[in-house]
Swiss-Prot record:
Comment field (misc): Carbon 2 of the heme B porphyrin ring is defined according to the Fischer nomenclature.
Taxonomic path: Bacteria, Pseudomonadati, Pseudomonadota, Gammaproteobacteria, Pseudomonadales
Pathway(s) this gene product operates in, as recorded in its UniProt entry: Porphyrin-containing compound metabolism; heme O biosynthesis; heme O from protoheme: step 1/1
Molecular function GO labels: protoheme IX farnesyltransferase activity
Name of the protein this chain belongs to: Protoheme IX farnesyltransferase
Length: 299
């Protein structure tokens, strides 16, 4: 077996290492960090902060994702969604993946310290540790509230972007964090319902496994209602204008439609469709924040 893994590990390509970083997840995080940067100032964001700040955040996020691959490699090898990942198939060794993660993390922090500020770097480090160590290494296997508690680390990018520009933590970026924090449970619990049997098989205590599907659907509805309320707050505190409010209402109504469909079992494959729409919801909501911000500047 060791020989087989060694031979397969030698076949690792740059695509395998790119996959370790979970590029699609990192891309969504970068969009929210970019929005945080642009919302932080009425002037332009310095190009060095824009380029190297986001690169630093991306490298740290990719490093945390690589650690996640290492810790979850046995789980990944069993689940249909993840069984072809590089570590699950033995194309990359755990040692190589951890070395890769370390290089990414150190490089990202060095860029943040050099081109942004110390607070942005330390908050990014805290987020990295929160996801890679606290969530992946402990919470994921310890409690059905893993997503709720660990979601704070994943919600940090808009705060990181804001702080990279201003060097300060204020109410506005914390509100952006709150939006992602409220979005995280319905996003992941919808996937957990869709993959319930697989999570049960690998003994990961996701909410549908420990408390049942109906209980999870109720909580998805509750968190979606909270998300909708929180998503209106940027308009309420004059952080955004009517264009954003309209987008928040329309996107929120569609998100609520899918969570109600999931609760009622009124649409086929409602769980995975809710999960997929939630990704577009967050992307579109933050783009609306950005567009609205520059429209406000024009008027």
């Amino acid at each position: 077996m060791a020989t087989l893994l060694s031979e397969r590990g030698a076949q690792a390509s740059w695509r395998d290492y790119l996959e370790l970083t979970k590029p699609k997840v990192v891309l969504l995080m970068l969009i929210t960090s970019l929005v945080g940067m642009f919302l932080a100032t009425r002037a332009g964001v310095p190009w060095t902060v824009l380029l190297f700040g986001n690169l630093g955040i991306a490298l740290c996020a990719g490093g945390a994702a690589a650690v996640n691959h290492v810790v979850d490699r046995q789980i990944d090898s069993v689940m249909a969604r993840t069984h072809k990942r590089p570590l699950a198939e033995g194309r990359v060794s755990p040692a190589a993946a951890l070395t890769f993660a370390f290089v990414l993390g150190v490089s990202g922090l060095a860029l943040l310290l050099t081109f942004t500020n110390a607070l942005a770097a330390w908050l990014t480090l805290a987020s990295l540790i929160g996801y890679a160590v606290i969530y992946t290494g402990f919470l994921k296997r310890a409690t059905p509230q893993n997503i709720v508690i660990g979601g704070l680390a994943g919600a940090a990018p808009p705060l990181l972007g804001w702080v990279a520009v201003t060097g300060q933590v204020t109410a506005e970026p914390l509100l952006l964090v709150l939006i992602i924090f409220a979005w995280t449970p319905p996003h992941f619990w919808a996937l957990a319902i869709h993959r319930k049997d697989e999570y049960a098989k690998v003994n990961v205590p996701m909410l549908p496994v420990t408390h049942g599907v109906h209980y999870t659907k109720v909580h998805i509805l509750l968190y979606t209602a909270m998300l909708l309320a929180v998503s209106f707050m940027p308009f309420a505190i004059h952080m955004s204008g009517p264009l954003y409010l309209a987008a928040a209402v329309l996107l929120g109504a569609r998100f609520l439609y899918w969570t109600i469909a999931l609760y009622r079992d009124s649409r086929p494959h409602a769980a995975i469709k809710t999960f997929k729409f939630s990704i577009w919801y967050l992307f579109a909501l933050f783009i609306a924040l950005l567009v609205d911000h520059y429209l406000l500047l024009d008027f």
